[in-house]
Every structure is written in structure tokens, then in C-alpha cells.
Swiss-Prot record:
The species this protein was found in: Aeromonas hydrophila subsp. hydrophila (strain ATCC 7966 / DSM 30187 / BCRC 13018 / CCUG 14551 / JCM 1027 / KCTC 2358 / NCIMB 9240 / NCTC 8049)
Keyword Coiled coil on entry: no
InterPro entries in the cross-refs: Na-dicarboxylate_symporter (IPR001991), Na:dicarbo_symporter_sf (IPR036458), Ser_Thr_transp_SstT (IPR023025)
Membrane topology label: Multi-pass membrane protein
Protein name: Serine/threonine transporter SstT
Family: Belongs to the dicarboxylate/amino acid:cation symporter (DAACS) (TC 2.A.23) family.
Gene name of this polypeptide: sstT
Organism superkingdom: Bacteria
Biological role stated in the UniProt entry: Involved in the import of serine and threonine into the cell, with the concomitant import of sodium (symport system).
Length: 416
């Protein structure tokens, strides 16, 4: 049996979060004590961002098409109330993020020539650009990273191929798995990429950039906490007409904590299943709704996409009217539903939202790089919100239909 090199064994046995933290610390130290070397280390960051730029368009195209093709027709799940809660929660999260971005605008350190950027004139121009992006050539859309066109073609082909042979569907599914594997390999390089990004950024712009990221992180986490402790309880109260906090806190404690550390909604599905069983929810419902929630219930992703996109807009000095902000919330909601099952999925969909404002893919990918720098906390908090909300909304919808579950569930209610 071949023995692994000790360094390889150490890397494989250490979590990606820990590796990113090490890369972050080394990047800061390099910028502080060896600024010239830090600027050279920027090559690692450039390679990492370049790899992301290369794989992101294909990733969106294949995953969306595979998801639509794989949908089972005629499957009776009684999922309408839960689906409504999923979409409502995701949209409200995006809307809260828009408001927070206006109240607490964040600026990023981006390398951009403002003369090359033409901001849209308003909602009419944005919609016109959207329409023309939809009808673009699919190959050109992939080459130009036109995510609106990519989404349109992926959805269209997915619907058209839903009646294809099982062999064809299997090929598309295998292709999506292959692309996801490549993405995971790129993400494994995140510690080195972040080391280079942090080192070169701090060496060139000083430590003000780090404080700028701190403010951005506060806005992101603040929005997620507001959704978890204010908006979600209001939605649950609307459904069950009782004090929502016992149920909310139970879901956060038993689902959110584990999701925070695993940073994977898919990995947290067994935890949510066990909690749903503990809450005595109907198995026919939660067996479908929880895996589905891990795919489309993405409040945290909607917040990430919106806040980082708005930060790019503020940095570039663009003005955003109310109608465009609402459209951004809708686009972020739809985009977030495609962010599941992919490491860094929400970050890779930021260019789609940025395209609404005429921001080039090069600049948008710099924003994605910023997201990876703060991703140690951002991704963990995002996953905790996403995954705990899956079981929360499933429980709320079931309890609204069957009031006996309110008394049977092992959480205190307000009437006790």
C-alpha cells in the first residue's frame, strides 16, 4: 500500500476552512513584513480568479439544465405551501440585503477604469439589456460570460429535453457532476489563492482594504441574523399563529450549528431529517421538502449575491433607482435557487447580478475574489441560515395544516 507524503496527508486531513484561515493569516503577515514578495504572490490570486472565471459560465449552464431535466413529473408532494415559504423567504432576504446595502454602503478595492464602465440609465435600459442578453447566441453567451443568456439557454434546453431518453439524461447529469468536480478542485486551491489575493491587496492598498472587508462582513452577517431572528419568525407566526421563537431556536440550535461547521446544505440533510422526525412531521412531506430546500431555499445565498453586487455598484459610483433595486432582488432570488450543491456557488453567481448594472465580468470576478477572502465566516453563516430554514419552513407549513403537531412537537408553545 502506497504511503501518502506527510504534507499531503496533513492537507487532506485539514478542513478547507482551516486552510483558508491559514492562507488569510499568511497573506496578512506577508504584506506586513515582505511587501515586495506579497505583490509577487498576487500571481497565485490571479490564477485562482482566472480559474473561477473559466469554469463559472459552464457551471451555471450545465447545473441549471441538469436540474430541470432531472425533475420528476407527476410526483405528488403537496409542496405548494412549503415552496411558497421557500421563495418568499429567499425574496425577503434579497430585499433586506438591498435595504441594508443602501443604509450601510460598502466600498471595495477593485482594479477598474471607470471610463470603461457605462452604468445603465434606469430600469428601462436594464430590461432592454436583459432582453437582448436573453436572445444571444449560446456559444457567444458562454464565451462572453453572459449569465442571463446562459440561464435562458439552460432553462430552454432543460425544458426541451425533459422527454429525452434516460441515457441522454444520464449523460447530462454525469456532465454536471464532472463540472462540479472541477469546481471542487478549483475551490481546493482557495487557500493559496486567498493568500495571494490578501497579500497583494494589502501590499498595494494598505490595511484600509481589510477594514473595508470587515464592514462588508458586518453587513452580510447582520442581514443574515436579521432574517434568522426577525423575518423568519414573522413568516412562521403568519403560518402557525403562535409564538414562533421556540421552533426557530430549536431549528437554529439543532440544524444551524452543524451546518455552520459543515458549510454544506447537502451534508446537513441527514441532520434536518432527524430533526423533522423529532418534530413528528409527516415523513412523506419532509422526505421531499428538505432535499428540495437544500436546492432552492437559499436566503443566505440571496443576501450574499445582493450585498456583494451592491458593494460593487457603490464602489464604481453608480446610482441605482428603486425599480432596478427591486429587479436585483428578483434576480438574486432566482440566482440563489441555482447556487446549491456547489462550493462557493453563491459567489460564482455574483457576475450574473452585476451584469444588470453593466459591470464587466473581469470586475465582477474581483468581487467574487473578495467574497472568498471573507468566505470563512460568510459561507458558514450562509449555510447555517439556508439549511436551518429548510426544516423551519417545512415544520411551519406542516403545523399550519395539522395543529396537533404544535402540541406534539418537543418545543414549548406560547400558550403553555
Amino acid at each position: 500500500m502506497t504511503q501518502q507524503h506527510p504534507l499531503v496527508r496533513l492537507v487532506n486531513s485539514t478542513s478547507l476552512v482551516s486552510q483558508i484561515l491559514v492562507g488569510l493569516v499568511f497573506g496578512i503577515l506577508l504584506a506586513m513584513f515582505m511587501p515586495e514578495w506579497a505583490k509577487t504572490a498576487g500571481l497565485l490570486g490571479s490564477l485562482f480568479v482566472g480559474a473561477l472565471k473559466a469554469v463559472a459560465p459552464l457551471l451555471v449552464f450545465v447545473l441549471v439544465m441538469a436540474a430541470i431535466i432531472g425533475h420528476k413529473q407527476g410526483q405528488k408532494t403537496n409542496m405548494k405551501p412549503i415552496l411558497l415559504l421557500y421563495l418568499l423567504g429567499t425574496f425577503l432576504a434579497a430585499a433586506v440585503a438591498v435595504v441594508a446595502s443602501f443604509l450601510f454602503p460598502s466600498n471595495l478595492h477593485l482594479v477598474a477604469n471607470s471610463a470603461e464602465i457605462t452604468p445603465p440609465g434606469g430600469i428601462t435600459e436594464v430590461l432592454q439589456t436583459l432582453l437582448f442578453n436573453v436572445v444571444t447566441n449560446p456559444v457567444k453567451a458562454l464565451l462572453d460570460a453572459n449569465y442571463i443568456g446562459i440561464l435562458a439557454w439552460a432553462i430552454g434546453l432543460g425544458i426541451a429535453m425533459r422527454h429525452a431518453s434516460e441515457g441522454t439524461k444520464a449523460v447530462i447529469t454525469d456532465l454536471s457532476h464532472g463540472v462540479s468536480t472541477i469546481v471542487k478542485a478549483v475551490i481546493r486551491c482557495a487557500p493559496l489563492g486567498i493568500l495571494g489575493l490578501v497579500a497583494s491587496t494589502l501590499a498595494e492598498t494598505g490595511f484600509d482594504a481589510l477594514f473595508g472587508y470587515a464592514q462588508l462582513l458586518v453587513v452580510l452577517i447582520g442581514c443574515m441574523l436579521f432574517i434568522a431572528f426577525v423575518v423568519n419568525p414573522l413568516i412562521v407566526f403568519w403560518k402557525i399563529k403562535r409564538n414562533p421563537y421556540p421552533l426557530v431556536l430549536t431549528c437554529l440550535k439543532e440544524s444551524g450549528v452543524t451546518a455552520f461547521f459543515t458549510r454544506s446544505s447537502a451534508a446537513n440533510i441527514p441532520v434536518n431529517m432527524a430533526l423533522a422526525e423529532k418534530l413528528r412531521l409527516p415523513e412523506d412531506t419532509y422526505a421531499v421538502s428538505i432535499p428540495l430546500g437544500a436546492t432552492i431555499n437559499m436566503a443566505g445565498a440571496a443576501i450574499t449575491i445582493t450585498v456583494l453586487s451592491m458593494a460593487a455598484v457603490h464602489t464604481l459610483g453608480m446610482e441605482v433607482d428603486l425599480a432596478t433595486a427591486i429587479l436585483l432582488s428578483v434576480v438574486a432570488t432566482i440566482s440563489a435557487c441555482g447556487a446549491s450543491g456547489v462550493a462557493g456557488g453563491s459567489l460564482l453567481l455574483i457576475p450574473l447580478a452585476c451584469s444588470l448594472f453593466g459591470i464587466s465580468n473581469d470586475i465582477a470576478m474581483q468581487v467574487v475574489a473578495v467574497g472568498f477572502i471573507i468566505g470563512v465566516l460568510q459561507d458558514s453563516a450562509e449555510t447555517a441560515l439556508n439549511s436551518s430554514t429548510d426544516v423551519l419552513f417545512t415544520a411551519a407549513a406542516c403545523m399550519a395544516e395539522d395543529e396537533t403537531l404544535l402540541d406534539a412537537a418537543p418545543v414549548p408553545n406560547s400558550e403553555a
